[in-house]
A protein has these predicted regions:
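Patatin-like phospholipase
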Residues: 1-155
Length: 155
């Protein structure tokens, strides 16, 4: 992996390492003392059902209720140290479902979820998570290095 020249090569090597070291098997099991897997499974099933049935009011309530940074201890660093690539599949599925649900709420029009309510919901959601920032320090001496970092992130 240290000799990988691009992300795809590194990812393939990391996945192979996880397969050989047992990380892939660990990833597939929901159970772990490091997070509340029952709560996450329950919330995932609830979000999927509400989205499938188009119950926007309950979906918005459920999202708002569960959108805080460490629901079920999912931000526990231990969960991100067992594998070189990824974490528990349940966490990945849950976060993907939350993201897809937020995308749907943003991109689609719903008669029972007017634009003003949608805007308030996303403003409150943004306040729950805060705002990310990229801070590059070191002044002009690291300017060229920072340019490379920005270019890599942009592409």
């Amino acid at each position: 992996m240290t000799h990988a020249t691009d992300y795809a090569t590194w990812r393939a090597a990391a996945r192979e390492h996880d397969r050989l070291s047992g990380g892939t098997d660990w990833r597939e099991l929901d159970e772990s003392p490091d997070y509340d897997y029952r709560l996450i499974r329950e919330r995932l099933n609830e979000l999927r059902a509400l989205r499938r049935h188009g119950d926007i009011a309950r979906l918005v309530y459920s999202l708002h209720e569960g959108l805080h940074g460490n629901l079920g201890n999912i931000a526990n660093p231990v969960l991100y140290s067992h594998c070189l690539f990824g974490t528990k599949r349940l966490l990945t599925e849950y976060l993907d479902e939350v993201a897809a649900t937020l995308d749907d709420l943003c991109d689609q029009d719903f008669p029972d979820f007017p634009l003003a309510a949608k805007l308030r919901f996303f403003e409150r959601t943004g306040q729950s998570f805060g705002r990310s920032a990229l801070m590059l320090s070191g002044g002009a001496t690291l300017g060229l290095f920072h340019s490379g970092v920005i270019k890599a992130l942009w592409t």
